[in-house]
Curated annotation (Swiss-Prot):
Inhibited by EDTA, Zn(2+) and by Mg(2+) plus Mn(2+); stimulated by Ca(2+) in the presence of Mg(2+). Changing residue 165 to A: Hyperactive mutant, increases recombination efficiency, more toxic than wild-type. Increased nuclease activity. Its EC number is 3.1.21.-. GO terms for biological process: DNA recombination. Keywords: DNA recombination, Endonuclease, Hydrolase, Magnesium, Nuclease. Signal peptide: none annotated. A low activity DNA endonuclease yielding 3'-hydroxyl ends, equally active on ss or dsDNA, not active on dsRNA. Shows no sequence specificity. Upon expression enhances RecA-independent DNA recombination 49-fold, concomitantly reducing viability by 88% and probably inducing DNA damage as measured by induction of the SOS repair response in RecA cells. Its cofactor is Mg(2+). This is Recombination-promoting nuclease RpnA. Disruption phenotype: Cells grow to slightly higher density than wild-type in sublethal levels of streptomycin. A quadruple rpnA-rpnB-rpnC-rpnD deletion shows no change in basal RecA-independent recombination.
C-alpha cells in the first residue's frame, strides 16, 4: 500500500463522493449493518475531522469519518469509511487503531462513555475477492488465543480482596502486595510478623527493602514508623543491622527534606541567609540548591 495514499486519484475521487452528506447517507443505507443503521438518526449525520489521528497513522489511510446521534437517548455512533485500492494483510488492525483513536477523541471532548465506532472498508483492488480477514484478532499469530484474551475481561490482580495467607505464598511479589494492600491502615504494627517472615525468605534485595520502607515512611503511618521498623528488625536478625541503617538514613533524609522545605519558604519570604542557616542547620551550599 502506498505510504501517501491520499495523493492518488483513487483516494481523491473516493473523498469527493463520500464527504458529501447525501452520498454518505446512501452509502450507509446500503452498507452499514442493518441493526446498527436502525439505531442511527441520519438527520444528524456530521463529517468529523481526523486531525486527532497520529501523523504516522493518518499517512497510511484514506478515510472519511462520519458521526450520527442515536435514535434512542444520548449517544453517538461513528462510521469510519476506509478506502483501499490495494489489499493489506494488517488493515483490520490499522482500522482498529483508528477506531480507538476516535473513541479517545470522543472522551477528550467530555463524554463519559465510549462511542460505537463502525469501521467499513471500501475496496476496489486487483485481487478479488478481498483476500484478508477484517477481524483484527486474525492479525495475531495465534488468533484463537487472541480471542480468549481480547473477547473477555482482562486479568485483575486485586490485592484488596486477596487473603494475607495467599499473599504470603507469592514469593518475590509478597512484600509489595502485602504492603500495598494494607498501606492505608492507620496502624501497620499488625504486619510486623509477616514482614519479618518475608524478609527472612531472602526474596527482596537491599534496594527493594530500602524503597519499601521509604514508601511506608512517606505513605503510611509516619508517627509509628520507628516502632514498626524496630519491630521488624528485632524479628529479622539477618537484616537487623541493615534495617536499622536504612531506618536512620530515611529519618535523616526526611529531616533534611523538611529543613529544605522550610528554608525555601524562608528564602521566598526574604529572611536573611544567616538566620535561615542558624534555624535549619543547613549549609550555604544546601541553601543555594534549595533556592534553585
Amino acid at each position: 500500500m502506498s505510504k501517501k495514499q491520499s495523493s492518488t486519484p483513487h483516494d481523491a475521487l473516493f473523498k469527493l463522493f463520500l464527504r458529501q452528506p447525501d452520498t454518505a447517507r446512501d452509502f450507509l443505507a446500503f452498507h452499514l449493518p442493518a441493526p446498527i443503521h436502525a439505531l442511527c438518526d441520519m438527520k444528524t449525520l456530521k463529517l468529523e475531522s481526523s486531525s486527532f489521528i497520529d501523523d504516522d497513522l493518518r499517512e497510511s489511510y484514506s478515510d472519511v469519518l462520519w458521526s450520527v446521534k442515536t435514535e434512542q437517548g444520548p449517544g453517538y455512533i461513528y462510521c469510519l469509511i476506509e478506502h483501499q485500492s490495494t489489499s493489506n494483510k494488517l488493515i483490520a488492525f490499522r482500522m482498529m487503531r483508528y477506531a480507538i483513536a476516535a473513541m479517545q477523541n470522543h472522551l477528550d471532548a467530555g463524554y463519559k462513555t465510549l462511542p460505537m465506532v463502525v469501521p467499513l472498508l471500501f475496496y476496489h483492488g486487483i485481487e478479488s475477492p478481498y483476500p484478508y480477514s477484517l477481524c483484527w484478532l486474525d492479525c495475531f499469530a495465534d488468533p484463537k488465543l487472541a480471542r480468549q484474551l481480547y473477547a473477555s475481561a482482562f486479568p485483575l490482580i486485586d490485592v484488596t480482596v486477596m487473603p494475607d495467607d495467599e499473599i504470603m505464598q507469592h514469593r518475590r511479589m509478597a512484600l509489595l502486595e502485602l504492603i500495598q494492600k494494607h498501606i492505608r491502615q492507620r496502624d501497620l504494627m499488625g504486619l510486623v510478623e509477616q514482614m519479618a517472615c518475608l524478609l527472612s525468605s531472602g526474596y527482596a534485595n537491599d534496594r527493594q527493602i530500602k524503597g519499601l520502607f521509604n514508601y511506608i515512611l512517606q505513605t503510611g503511618d509516619a508517627v509509628r514508623f520507628n516502632d514498626f521498623i524496630d519491630g521488624v528488625a528485632e524479628r529479622s536478625p539477618k537484616h537487623k543491622e541493615s534495617l536499622m541503617t536504612i531506618a536512620e538514613r530515611l529519618r535523616q533524609e526526611g529531616e533534611q527534606s523538611k529543613a529544605l522545605h522550610i528554608a525555601k519558604i524562608m528564602l521566598e519570604s526574604g529572611v536573611p541567609l544567616a538566620d535561615i542557616m542558624r534555624f535549619t542547620g543547613l549549609s550555604e551550599e544546601e541553601l543555594a540548591a534549595a533556592s534553585q
